[in-house]
Amino acid sequence: MRFLLGLQYFASKKGVGSTKNGRDSESKRLGAKKSDGQFTNAGSIIYRQRGTKIHPGLNVGRGGDDTLFALISGIVKYEKFGKNRTRVSVIPN
């Protein structure tokens, strides 16, 4: 006589699936690099941005990536203009 036993083995550990999360891009360090009233040298970055959140004023240049930089050495001055726009200028001292 032959007996066939139907044995079934169950997992002793739960199977762990992979996830598609768990990565992020490096931060771009955008924002103000010089604050109002602070001294800056010519060529120094004043504000890093995407688009023109802050507009260039007197003695301030705008780079290809919309970064604002000082054209001369002086004091940084942020000012409101228009309805809801801001510009940054460098005042020579």
UniProtKB/Swiss-Prot annotation:
NCBIfam families: L27 (TIGR00062). Residues 21-36 have a biased composition (Basic and acidic residues). Pfam families: Ribosomal_L27 (PF01016). SUPFAM superfamilies: Ribosomal L27 protein-like. It comes from Mycoplasma capricolum subsp. capricolum (strain California kid / ATCC 27343 / NCTC 10154). The N-terminus is cleaved by ribosomal processing cysteine protease Prp. One of its GO terms (molecular function) is structural constituent of ribosome. One of its GO terms (biological process) is translation. One of its GO terms (cellular component) is cytosolic large ribosomal subunit. InterPro entries: Ribosomal_bL27, Ribosomal_bL27_CS. This is Large ribosomal subunit protein bL27.
